[in-house]
Amino acid sequence: MLKPLFGKADKTPADVVKNLRDALLVIDRHGTNTSERKVEKAIEETAKMLALAKTFIYGSDANEPNNEQVTQLAQEVYNANVLPMLIKHLHKFEFECKKDVASVFNNLLRRQIGTRSPTVEYLAARPEILITLLLGYEQPDIALTCGSMLREAVRHEHLARIVLYSEYFQRFFVFVQSDVFDIATDAFSTFKDLMTKHKNMCAEYLDNNYDRFFGQYSALTNSENYVTRRQSLKLLGELLLDRHNFSTMNKYITSPENLKTVMELLRDKRRNIQYEAFHVFKIFVANPNKPRPITDILTRNRDKLVEFLTAFHNDRTNDEQFNDEKAYLIKQIQELRV
């Protein structure tokens, strides 16, 4: 007698995960030839089991999710170690199946038992899974799916720390400049989360890795890619103005080279670049303890800067904060003396 193929009642979470693991093992052994019938069937079975797993987690039109079954499913997923296999073979799945992988992964990450987050603990013990997700940005067909899972993971500080302090973190400086707009944007979103979500951890990272980080970051603010340049300038302003990054800000705004770069960006032909550069430039000028090299540059260019700023974005008549800041900068620069 043939078993029913569908129906939540027909399979337990243990059945679903066992079938999923068996299918993934076939792909593991024979996956180099995805046109081989046994691999095709295994990929189909993977998609089918993932859809059932998703039904356990999210429920269906007819049934609400059952917490006991969700807990059982999660435990079976951990015990069977199917998450690394799903991510390893993600590029072989159809679009809907990839989405289901991300849905299941992200939901499991959000699960808590009291103060514990079992999936966070599971991933923390297997950092290679996080690195595989990060390197997913190198493959256009899975980049966005991997990005969504990685962003969900780095919401948890312990997992974010693993990624941030990994040697592979530096790859973000390449990914955010991808020629593929969607990949570059997605990678920057993940990069920004890594640098801003966990304030104390990020401040510590920037303090300990200042030269390396900003040596690479300067390539982003000078990128030929408009979106990369604008996003990186905006993030730079946010990082420098965050009180947690006070020591990093002090170091950054005492560099004459940084000031020269920002002054050049103020004159960029694109208005949005000018505007973001303004919000970095103002930190240099507002610093009450400007070192002599910074004061010298501002003083040497005093008249030109006053003239430039007086005419700068005068159409922003409704932006009261911007106009107040601009007036303050003009006053500060006018008061500089040789």
Swiss-Prot record:
A molecular-function term among this protein's GO annotations: protein serine/threonine kinase activator activity
UniProt keyword terms in alphabetical order: Cytoplasm, Cytoskeleton
Signal peptide span: none
Location in or out of the cell: Cytoplasm, Cytoskeleton, Spindle pole
Disruption phenotype: RNAi-mediated knockdown results in the production of additional AVM/PVM neuronal precursors.
Record bears the keyword Calcium: no
GO CC annotation terms, alphabetical: cytoplasm; spindle pole
UniProt GO BP: asymmetric neuroblast division; intracellular signal transduction
Protein family according to the UniProt entry: Belongs to the Mo25 family.
UniProt xrefs under PANTHER family: CALCIUM-BINDING PROTEIN 39-RELATED (PTHR10182), MO25-LIKE PROTEIN 2 (PTHR10182:SF13)
Its job: Regulates asymmetric cell division in Q.p neuroblast lineage. Plays a role in cell shedding during embryogenesis.
The protein's name: MO25-like protein 2
Species in which this protein is naturally found: Caenorhabditis elegans
